[in-house]
Amino acid sequence: MAYTELNIELTDEQRAIKEETHRFSKEVLRPASIELDKLDRPDDVIKSPLFWDTMKKGYDLGYHTVFIPDTWGGLGLEPLEVHLVLEELGWGSADFAIALGVACFPAFFASMVPNEILAEKIIEPFCEDKDASIIGCWGITEPDHGTDTLCPGTPEFRDPNINGQVTARLDGDEWVIEGQKSAWVSNGTIATHSLVYLSIDPSMGMAGGGICIVPLDQPGVRKGKPLDKLGQRALNQGEIFFDGARIPRDYMLVEPESYEALMDITLATANAGMGAVFTGVARAAYEEALNYAKNQRVQGGKYLFEHQAIKHKLFNMFMKIEAARALSRAAVIYNMNNTPPMTEYSIAAKVFCTNTAFEVANDAVQIFGGYGVSREYPVEKFFRDARASLIEDGANDSLMITGAHAL
């Protein structure tokens, strides 16, 4: 059962966008992610023709440019349409929804501070790509820094004793990059370009950072092995090492004077997007459980749904999903339309929606009983994917502390 769209102001075009994305997710993303999830080694995932065929199909439809304006060749979606697309992609596969979303980060941030070189070398080639030959990654976490990098506006962000492990120094007309990004870099070992967050002025603490684009096919760049993890196993993640990598001066998008403001935009964009994606994951788990209870499983001589305890559980799941959609949609729409963003709402959306996805998936497993932990049904994958979401893009407990600073 698909949810009922309560926004009666959706245009026919917006409904068509939603339906087309849902069809792609149902026919391509979900089957592929389930098959790739069964592979034992993460190396096997990125060597699989199925993985690359799925990425290419996503690129061919432009889902790698969801956040990029049409003036640069992106899909040019309105904020509401972005939410519709992200939820449907998440319904199909959190793995691929995140991979396609993160792939655009270098080009997306370049489009916010464009120049002729960035347009020619980064933005336009990425938007024109139809075969996933240009893939971005988000190089923000480090071996000693995770969610603590995502705290703009807090006293800790300006503590000179806390600094990033990746650094940049200017050498003539080039920046020289040194250091290591952690194993949690999404798309890390398959990316061609990285959006790198680094330290330029350590006396300012984390606030003395910069954001740059680093082509990864150059001397001085080395990638680690793909990370083997519990959930979202089709989402490639891995370390990146910089040892004297060089970039043109124009590839440094943000320097310390505007770093904190851009970090705020980063957090608002990523967290709101995660809220939309995991609303989709929650919905996927709920729909599987509802169908199983109403049409498949008989217990005590009647379908599971006829038992009051199951009705109560399913309606509780339904309520949570509707609330998650409302919050994440509001955060996406407001923060894509306004600068500076209200980041606390994006944080609230990320925390609430990922918690909802985990709780709903957990309830779905319980409704399925023994089959809930069997790979015969997809709810166990939704459960594992949702569990990972409580940590990625900022651990929920820590994000709530960051969000509280704005209250």
Predicted stretch roles:
Residues M1-G92, E116-I117, D129, L170-W175, ...:
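Alpha-helical interface subdomain recognition
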Residues I134-R169:
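A gly/ser-rich beta-alpha-beta helix-loop segment of oxidoreductase catalytic cores
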Residues A94-A99, E116-E124, D131-C137:
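Short secondary-structure capping/junction motifs at helix and strand boundaries
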Residues D217-R246:
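Flexible, small-/acidic-enriched active-site or ligand-binding loops
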Residues P155-D159, W184-S186, S203, K229-N236:
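Short Gly/Pro-enriched turn/cap motifs at secondary-structure boundaries
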Residues A97-A119, T149:
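N-terminal glycine-rich flavin-associated loop
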